[in-house]
């Protein structure tokens, strides 16, 4: 990290507050060893059990980027889950993302639900946030994704 983040704070050892937050809040729960495998297996078992008799046992949000694409593949092919793929089209989809979603959903034999946000409304909201000059200009889009 560097000082391009105007609110960053470095301690006497040169370690930034973002790194300290990671060490304090994330790292204690980040198990990349057998413990993590057991925790994942337990969670997947609970998901499967809750999904017995249902068409889907989970929902996966997919943008078409590498992270959500890999998660979708992993859930279906490696973990044996039956996800419904959910995509929010807020007007910013690249053709590459759309192609990735279609190829992965078709290739894995999954169902896709796409929620299309009114582009005119989203554009006006994002423009208002941009003109206001405040932080977090992606707030309207983020709210649509998590609503």
Give the predicted meaning of each segment:
Residues 1-147:
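ATP-dependent adenylation/nucleotidyltransferase module used to activate substrates
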